[in-house]
Amino acid sequence: MKVQQYRLDELAHLVKGELIGEGSLQFSNLASLENAEVNHLTFVNGEKHLDQAKVSRAGAYIVTAALKEHLPEKDNFIIVDNPYLAFAILTHVFDKKISSTGIESTAQIHPSAVISKTAYIGHYVVIGENCVVGDNTVIQSHTKLDDNVEVGKDCFIDSHVTITGGSKLRDRVRIHSSTVIGGEGFGFAPYQGKWHRIAQLGSVLIGNDVRIGSNCSIDRGALDNTILEDGVIIDNLVQIAHNVHIGSNTAIAAKCGIAGSTKIGKNCILAGACGVAGHLSIADNVTLTGMSMVTKNISEAGTYSSGTGLFENNHWKKTIVRLRQLADVPLTQITKRLDHIQAQIESLESTFNLRK
């Protein structure tokens, strides 16, 4: 198969960059500084990468004007304010796109479902009663859309995804393999030593430009809906419980778990393996560092941490012993000791000042 080539001046135009060098050069792909060849375009994202750039074999470089001055031995550049953003834009140029439309013969679609003529429905897809699939949406093989599910325009639903509970997806949503949207929330009423299942009657609403990774679970609401606003991005292996509300442009990394009825604000970042207890509220513009555990409301923007960083093993054991010893000492006793030490310091300072 012939590889698509792009001229350097075409690529510069796409990112609104300034071309320096030979615009007619042809490029077949993007590549890292380390592995780029003469037919590859690469980018330099900061001064720390300049040493790599100087020895790279790439045919052209996406850089800022300031970074270019450090590469006098190179000839071909695209000058932009943000090289990483330009790189992100150009990845879509070189990405292999699914251009098929229509419905594969093995798909099972209920007669009441409304499927756009420009959509693609892959092999062994099952689409239930009263479903809607919008223009240019791709649904890969072995995916199931249960009754009353709606998927908007320009969406991509990868293989083995299940969307149920009457979930509604807006436009340009991407969902990757083996994720479940709208599954039953974890709701049970305890009575007389038994757990009594609560039927989940809400749904899941997903906004525009949302990206959800593989092997995620986003549960339908118990009564109200679980909501992901526009621009939310979610990594693999994330659990979002029933009635959670996630604000626009929030990013959630792998292995995070968010318990039920919690509301997370806009433009937040949850780093890997964070846990958020239920029925809490987190303000806009909050960052949680890796392995943080949120057990109370966060009302102000900022960066918060609770995960313990790595220790050498023997150091860790000694630290744990000290923590246990500290826990055995009453807080009032510690406070009295600190007050006594403070009084001694003040007495010494007073004596020293008098002798002056």
From Swiss-Prot:
**Which top-level group of life is the source organism from?**
Bacteria
Q: Which GO terms describe its cellular component?
A: membrane
Q: Does the keyword Lipid metabolism apply?
A: yes
Alphabetically sorted, this entry's keywords are: Acyltransferase, Lipid A biosynthesis, Lipid biosynthesis, Lipid metabolism, Repeat, Transferase
Query: Where along the chain is the active site annotated?
Result: H242
Q: In which pathway does it act?
A: Bacterial outer membrane biogenesis; LPS lipid A biosynthesis
Q: Which SUPFAM superfamilies match?
A: Trimeric LpxA-like enzymes
Any one GO molecular function term: N-acyltransferase activity
The reply to whether Cell membrane figures as a keyword in the UniProt entry is: no
Q: How does it assemble?
A: Homotrimer.
Q: Which PANTHER family match?
A: UDP-3-O-ACYLGLUCOSAMINE N-ACYLTRANSFERASE, UDP-3-O-ACYLGLUCOSAMINE N-ACYLTRANSFERASE 1, MITOCHONDRIAL-RELATED
In terms of HAMAP family, this protein maps to: LpxD
The entry's protein name is UDP-3-O-acylglucosamine N-acyltransferase
What species is given as this protein's source?
Acinetobacter baumannii (strain ACICU)
